Amino acid sequence: MKTIYLIGGTMGVGKTTVSQQLKKELPNSVFLDGDWCWDADPFQVTEETKAMVMRNICFLLNSFLHCTAYKNIIFCWVMHEQSIIDEIINSLDTGNARVIKISLMIDETNLRKRLSADIARGIRSNDVIDRSVARINMYQILDTIKVDTVNKNVYEIVSEILTL
């Protein structure tokens, strides 16, 4: 049986870092960052582009699920609404897969510190802080396993995920 990990969280919580390390820890694993399916300039949020990114994500995840080379599929994306998670899961062929839905959690103070450091390094723009902070509480109500990232390094977070 395969396992697919859906890892959500607000911008800057550490989804990509955790997912990359999880990929190294799990055998026969593959990783998809949802941002790779919608990397455009200018970034346009319309009904058409939202439908397109969902098709892109589900096509790739189903390709991984059907590929015999992979046992563990890791997907990360913001996924701040239950409807997004549900649409992805309902579009996947999970008959031979265990689905683990995770939300990486953080408090506002620590999120601001992480994002400010990213801004200082030129990785993110200034406007990300308010947008990301506004989404923190949205993850509390999702049907996901909550993994707290505060005062933990990536290895501790991954170790916790590996026990699920």
Where are these regions (language model features)?
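Conserved phosphate-donor/acceptor-positioning beta-strand/loop module used by diverse small-molecule
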Residues: 95-115
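Walker A/P-loop
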Residues: 16
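Small-molecule kinase domains that catalyze NTP-dependent phosphoryl transfer to phosphate-bearing small molecules
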Residues: 117-160
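ATP-binding Walker
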Residues: 13
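Glycine-rich phosphate-binding loop used to anchor ATP phosphates in small-molecule kinases
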Residues: 52-96
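P-loop (Walker A) phosphate-binding loop of NTP-binding proteins
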Residues: 10
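Hydrophobic anchor at the beta1->P-loop junction of P-loop NTPases
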Residues: 7
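Conserved substrate/cofactor phosphate-moiety recognition/catalytic segment
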Residues: 19-62
